[in-house]
Amino acid sequence: PLYSSAASDVYKRQVLIGAAKYLAQTRNFDGTAVLIFQPAEEGRGGAKAMLEDGLFDTFPCDAIYALHNWPGLKPGTIGINPGPMMAAADRFEIQITGRGGHGAHPYQTIDPVTIAGQIITALQTIVSRNVNPLDSAVVSIGSMQAGHPGAMSVIPREAKLVGTVRTFRKSVQEMVETRMRELVTAIAGAFGGTAELIYERIYPATLNTPQHANLVADIATEMIGKENVVRDLVPSMGSEDFSFMLQSKPGAYFRLGQGGADSGCVLHNSHFDFNDAVIPLGSAMFCALAERGMPLAD
């Protein structure tokens, strides 16, 4: 069997290089350990591109593991969940078309801004009224564009909304998209306009295989003690392109605690400072996963 560990940022490369050095020197495993230095975690996902290029055809493996540092966990801790770790990420764009005109004569127009406002409000009812409260979903509008910033008395012809949907379950994801299409079409029509919803599924949910997640937790417990291992880490509504690899191979994605959240230096913050002291633990986890997954014959 082969084990693989994915990385995309500088610190994760350092973690993998440390693991590679130890595994090459000790050879305390029977098999091949594949270390994946994945580019382009952000954007449209380097993991998917690597899979499309035949990653697992060139480097077959039976299981795959990845880690990500986590400011919300104290240094020297490991966090994992035997099921969902991160949500699916969808992008949507709503193009609204009305009839432009003078702001002093709105009755002669079909105002796309008014339609946009109604759609924004209605979309928030999907989570509160259509999603089972025992499930999780997010519908967020990140951008609204209409008219010219300096045109105080011009009602534009068009407006555009851009946002994201986050879900864990595919059935919830499909229901949210269906309800969005129904609401967008009906609301625009009710005001005399039209609207087109462009819905794109970017990242699937990051779902750990219970067997492999439990192995991570067991190894971490032996290594750093059960008091430093969170086995039921609360899933994040953020997204991760390692999810594509977990769709192809069983495995697990876990968190490497690094601290710093209390000071506000969280991920994607310009003042973020990676805690170099946690690198050895990350390397040790990957080494132990390779050795435990591919033990030497007695």
Feature-to-residue mapping (PLM):
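Short alpha-helix boundary/capping segments
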Residues: 8, 104-112, 274-282
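Midchain, well-structured core segments that form catalytic/ion-binding scaffolds
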Residues: 59-208, 235-237, 243
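Acidic/histidine-rich catalytic neighborhood of metal-dependent amide-processing enzymes
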Residues: 14-82, 132, 146-149
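Buried hydrophobic packing segments
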Residues: 12-23, 116-119, 123, 283-290
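Single conserved hydrophobic/aromatic residue that forms the stacking wall/gate
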Residues: 1-7, 11
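Divalent metal-coordination and catalytic microenvironments
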Residues: 35, 50, 102, 116, ...
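Short, low-order "capping/linker" segments at domain edges
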Residues: 206-219, 223
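Zn-dependent metallopeptidase/amidohydrolase metal-coordination segment
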Residues: 226, 230-296
